[in-house]
Amino acid sequence: MPSKLAIFGCGSDLSTNIEKLKKEFEIVGVFDNNSELHGKEKHGFKISNPEKILTFNFETLKICSLANTTKIRAQVIDLGVPEEKIIPTPLWCDRNLAKWTKLRNERNRERVFIIGNGPSLTLEDLNLLHLNNEACFAFNKIYLAFEESDFRPTYYMVEDTLVAKNNARKIDALHGFPKFYPEHLLRTLMMSNDVLIFGQNLPNANYEMATEPSSEPTDFGWGSTVTCTAIQAAIYLGFSKIHLLGVDFNFEWSGEKVSEKNVLIGQGETNHFHKDYRPAGEKWNAPKMDITESHYILLQEFAARIGVEIINSTRGGKLEVFPRVSLEQALA
């Protein structure tokens, strides 16, 4: 007889998995935090208030969400659901957590460079970091430099949904270094042995504010840019000195077409280090500079409390939250 299953979350992840779950389990209840859904049906199941979860007889609970699973997991445990009843999400599975621990234990340097893709970044900079054998985080379309440089990142990260969708095949083809993705990108990018999943403490549905930084990969704070997430990952890994390079913090998108709220259509913007970075017609998310700046301030305060230095080694740009030291001075 199939075991009795409770499901938390009734969004797109449930729609994707419901038929498979029906075959494998006896579904006894579906729960969601959206009070407007309570009492309504989805996929033939009545949606209930999570506060009533212990009134249902179930053996296991599955979180059907690829966002804020850390919050949901903590919520159901607080409601009295035994931890051992919760089916681990990709973020919380033992294998993923072990990968994070292994990387932290393998770190053998105190300094790391976090490389933004701003126009100030040059191939000469990347080659210099390569020749100096520096630990580096890089992001998104950094692979555009690979044909012209021997530089390869120590760690690669992507978190933006449109970046992942637009470049999934190229990102999936990247190998030779760990790749960090948030849980929600598992809908878009392939899982492989070199992929590590991180969780994010996302704000309200409109993404109107930054969230508190964390050094735990299950619950990184959100600052509307992958750079903020990488700083937190670097802190988790144990780096005590973090240099930013190519983080110009100076976007211009007045010439772009607006597709929908906060989504632009590329018309030749030149905010990045490579001429082919933004092909015409590509959709991209407009930066939320005020949110990012507020998160940089939170990160500076967070890092100072735990004895970590964040230094801006970008050539020029408009980011003045962190003290500046030139790349040449840093490598001298």
How would you label these PLM feature ranges?
Residues M1-A6, K52-L54, A234:
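Hydrophobic, helix-prone linear segments
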Residues P2-L21, V30, G116:
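Glycine-rich adenosine-cofactor-binding loop
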Residues F25-I27, P153:
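Core-facing hydrophobic residues within beta-strands of well-ordered domains
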Residues V28-S35, F137-K141:
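A short beta-strand-loop structural module common to alpha/beta enzyme folds
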Residues S35-R95:
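Phosphate-bearing ligand-interacting subdomains
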Residues K71-A332:
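Metal-ion/cofactor- or nucleotide/acyl-coenzyme-handling active-site neighborhoods
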